[in-house]
Amino acid sequence: MAKLIKCINSAAGEHFSVYNGDCVSVASQFPDETVGFSIYSPPFQNIFTYSDSELDMGNCASDEEFDAHYQFLIKQMYRLTKPGRLTAVHCSDLPSSKWKDGVIGLKDFPGDIVRAHQAEGWIFHSRVCVWRDPVVEMTRTKALGLLYKQLKKDSTRSRMGIADYVLVFRKPGDNAEPVEQMPENFPVSQWQKWASPVWMDINQTNTLNVRMAKDNADEKHLCPLQLDLIERAVTLWSNPGNVVLSPFMGIGSEGVSSLKLKRKFIGIELKPSYFKHAVRYLEAAERQESLFTIEMASDETACEIAE
């Protein structure tokens, strides 16, 4: 990625390059078939607002508008990925609301993602269900279907909690560089655990500190991926030295995990405050500083942003 990339801002270390800008615009400038693996969490249609930027995919008038915008990125990800290699997309079912959708229920966002990738030539490779605590969801969202009083009143309106999913897609073609797992580093007992269609042991609180990325001007939602989930995917589907890409870098979770596992990282993030703190995390990861140390420093910065 030696060419000059047109973007708002950029930063680089020995093993990472990150860009502040629109993910489709920036990704379109990268060379073909240079990415060994990608993992990211896209905006969940227009459920959450991440910023006020008109370039933000989350700022869309409808699900159809989001799908059209997201399709451009999927096309770029296909072009960038090496043949036989994978992309992993974190997502979940989305709640529908009476005021917006006409009914209270769920929308099949994972299904939309699968169909969108298949339309661009990706092969649907795997789906992992990531368990989430329904009590935490009920406490946070007060969703009618999870309330005990609704169960007592009329349990036909009661539902299960919403799980997370990791959808994995493979680019057709032969993989020129097999990802070989050695028994001394990846015993069969570990594979039996990871091969489960449901990952029950992902620690939902094992995330980078998010307080420092708050921007009072437009911050509405921030939910970084769990580090153990990222590390599991990167270990399973890439080799040390491979390039790992995240087009929705956020505060740098995928990058920190990739550097920890001796991969190279390329990230794109639209929001300047997220980008700024992602750079801090990535620089600290290259120096192998304690994440606790950089979080403490970032908390001080959060106070500066809020003032």
Segments and roles (model prediction):
Residues 2-277, 307:
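Core catalytic lobe of class I
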Residues 20-25, 295-302:
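Conserved SAM/SAH-binding loop
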Residues 279-296:
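DNA/chromatin major-groove-contacting recognition/catalytic segments
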Residues 290, 302-307:
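Short, intrinsically disordered terminal tails adjacent to the first/last structured region
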